[in-house]
Amino acid sequence: MLRLWPGGAPGGLASILLRISLRLALWLPPLTLGSALAEGPGELYVPQHMPHHLVPAARSHAPLRAGHAGTTYIFGRDGGLIVYTWPPNDRPSTRADRLAVGFSTQQKDAVLVRVDSSSGLGDYLQLQIERGNIKVVFNVGTDDINIEETSKFVNDGKYHIVRFTRSGGNATLQVDDLPVIERYPSGNIDNERLAIARQRIPYRLGRVVDDWLLDKGRQLTIFNSQTTIKIGGWEKGSRPFQGQLSGLYYNGLKVLNMAAEGDPNVRVEGSARLVGDMPSSSITPQSSVSAAGNRSETSPSITDITTTTASNRQGKQTTTPQDDLLVASAECPSDDEDIDPCDPSSGGLAHPPLPEAKGYPSPEVIRESSSTTGMVVGIVAAAALCILILLYAMYKYRNRDEGSYHVDESRNYISNSATQPNGAAVKEKPIGVPKNKKDKKNKDKEYYV
């Protein structure tokens, strides 16, 4: 630290004033300039009062990925079919599956999506409408496993979203914003039979049997050699779907997008028709409120379809209601920890577009460059003046310790001593020693008169 006094910094008030002045000199000007420049040169943000109101919104617990409902196909009365076929050398076998789709229809019974394995294996997964309720049936080598949502009818012509996940023999199903239904096979009967059978198995064969059962159990939880994904269910003896399907997602595949882009592994048959010219087409449903659950739902008709329009940076953006965005959550429909995480290649996270606020003015930005500059200059000048005052006070305090003392020589009370200008006494040689010797000699003399 820089020493201002040769004998060290004074204590007490001077030390405190020194610290305050140094801190003001170092920090006050930069902080003043930084706060003035933080809002931009010559701009003051003046927010206006925005009236608040309640807006009902239905949000999904699953993360949103895309900014629109996805590619939409309409299936007419004559029936249509979209088939995706895996290449022969690229047929997956999965332990966990994810399926999600948005749709609207008035049919009580129809097949929406079906995934089949190679011929001879018998594994399959089917999403269907049965008696107006959503139902999923799958078989991965044991028996048919069913999971169904019976608390809500989906054949009302409104827009609905279905999310299904499978992990081994366990499954979950969710329709719109209803609670998730879980299905966990108990398997107690098989465990009891296995315990009885182990008692009759010879000890030397126990290890071989355990290995076989373990391998068999693994096979009974895997959807082996998947070959096709069929959308629409238009086949001989099947229940064709009539209505619209949007944003279908299955294990990282967006089959409707691939069909719209002309993928060679996808073929379109029958009366299936793409809505719009681009895969980014979306559905604009009409919002309605259900009386039972008091939830925000959507009721689109098949003809109420529009395409997403691009907007520039300063213009208005055409957005869709928030219920459309729930279809995009098909890419990650569940947060179950037992299921593998979402494929990062399926898309990045994105914020859902918010509906445009109408009738409320936007905050104004008022430019006042001259007043802002004057304020900054005034603050800096005041800080400099404070520093100068503190330095002057410290200077006066320092000079008080080095004052001089004046001596009036006319009133010299000590005749044999002298003083310096600063008051210190000066030592002189004693003159009384030779005088004493002279007096001693005078004592020996006698005078006679």
From Swiss-Prot:
Membrane topology, from the record: Single-pass type I membrane protein
Laminin G-like domain ranges (all copies): 71-272
Cytoplasmic side: 395-449
Record keywords: Cell adhesion, Membrane, Signal, Transmembrane, Transmembrane helix
UniProt-annotated stretches for the region Disordered: 276-366, 415-449
Listed GO CC annotations: membrane
Membrane-spanning ranges: 374-394
Gene3D superfamilies, A to Z: 2.60.120.200
Compositionally biased spans, kind Polar residues: 312-322
Domain of life assignment: Eukaryota
Signal peptide stretch: 1-38
An example Gene Ontology biological process: sprouting angiogenesis
Compartments in which it is found: Membrane
Any single Pfam family the record assigns to this protein: Laminin_G_2
Biased composition (Low complexity): 280-311
Function: Neuronal cell surface protein that may be involved in cell recognition and cell adhesion. May play a role in formation or maintenance of synaptic junctions.
Stated family: Belongs to the neurexin family.
Name the UniProt record assigns to this protein: Neurexin-1a-beta
Organism annotation: Danio rerio (Zebrafish)
